[in-house]
Amino acid sequence: MFEIHPVKKVSVVIPVYNEQESLPELIRRTTKACESLGKEYEILLIDDGSSDNSAHMLVEASQAEGSHIVSILLNRNYGQHSAIMAGFSHVTGDLIITLDADLQNPPEEIPRLVAKADEGYDVVGTVRQNRQDSWFRKTASKMINRLIQRTTGKAMGDYGCMLRAYRRHIVDAMLHCHERSTFIPILANIFARRAIEIPVHHAEREFGESKYSFMRLINLMYDLVTCLTTTPLRMLSLLGSIIAIGGFSIAVLLVILRLTFGPQWAAEGVFMLFAVLFTFIGAQFIGMGLLGEYIGRIYTDVRARPRYFVQQVIRPSSKENE
């Protein structure tokens, strides 16, 4: 039996990108939820290079009397997961909860995650009930979740929900990983001995629009595929072999038909030859693109540039910047 350590301090990590409309309500509701815990807490808000007034509002919130808010300002936009990792590097709690700033996942669910973590779980995930997203987002999410489950063997139902709780040793383990492309829920489950999911409410977005454009979703998909496994590279080799065998077989067939039916038939098959040629060329480009994605990520890792740069940290105990 493993010793279960009770949670003494909770750190809530929230990435913020152009969320000035939702910030006042986010801070109020998150603070109220944390106060109901009866434990020490801190709320870390990471500004991910916002172009609106979000950064200024975060600084004011940290400097308010009696504040529990730590504001971390990044110099530019690095993406949701990099911003969360920046928050992880400044937490002081022994249980860390991540939460989106759009209020689609209610902060009022925080006490339930803390209570479940107190049962001895390393990671507490969540599954969104009655999800209030578009059909495209929900369908894409289901496909990605199935891909992750088959690849990792972890029966987690909703990897896309960022309302999650992590024990401190899990966060420390993730901080020791230096890959540039990080998908936090998957990375955490690699180190977790005990993980569980609980159902949570999901609300419509009240302010603004989703920051995940179509291209950002495509980039996220590449992050998932390349950080999970090298299986696509093996599949690429298999596909190349199939195409090579198929091309050779078609060539033999064309020679036989040419000898059997004469040159007139061959002339009439020109368009079919072009169609086959373009099919093979397209398959080659797909394979080259996938291979290039892996090589590009290797190049990024070799350069060893930091995944984020923290410009300022404002803590409630002092108005001085770190």
Swiss-Prot record:
The keyword Lipid biosynthesis applies. It catalyses: UDP-4-deoxy-4-formamido-beta-L-arabinose + di-trans,octa-cis-undecaprenyl phosphate = 4-deoxy-4-formamido-alpha-L-arabinopyranosyl di-trans,octa-cis-undecaprenyl phosphate + UDP. The lineage of its organism: Bacteria, Pseudomonadati, Pseudomonadota, Gammaproteobacteria, Enterobacterales. The keyword Transmembrane applies. It is a multi-pass membrane protein. It is an enzyme of class 2 (transferase). NCBIfam families: PRK10714.1 (NF007986). This is Undecaprenyl-phosphate 4-deoxy-4-formamido-L-arabinose transferase. Keywords: Antibiotic resistance, Cell inner membrane, Cell membrane, Glycosyltransferase, Lipid A biosynthesis, Lipid biosynthesis, Lipid metabolism, Lipopolysaccharide biosynthesis, Membrane, Transferase, Transmembrane, Transmembrane helix. Residues 257-269 are periplasmic. It holds the Pfam family Glycos_transf_2. GO terms for cellular component: plasma membrane. Catalyzes the transfer of 4-deoxy-4-formamido-L-arabinose from UDP to undecaprenyl phosphate. The modified arabinose is attached to lipid A and is required for resistance to polymyxin and cationic antimicrobial peptides. Its EC number is 2.4.2.53. InterPro entries: ArnC_tfrase, Glyco_trans_2-like, Glycosyltransferase_2, Nucleotide-diphossugar_trans. Belongs to the glycosyltransferase 2 family. The chain crosses the membrane at residues 236-256, 270-290. Residues 1-235, 291-322 are cytoplasmic. One of its GO terms (molecular function) is undecaprenyl-phosphate 4-deoxy-4-formamido-L-arabinose transferase activity. GO terms for biological process: 4-amino-4-deoxy-alpha-L-arabinopyranosyl undecaprenyl phosphate biosynthetic process; lipid A biosynthetic process; lipopolysaccharide biosynthetic process; response to antibiotic. Gene3D superfamilies: Spore Coat Polysaccharide Biosynthesis Protein SpsA, Chain A.
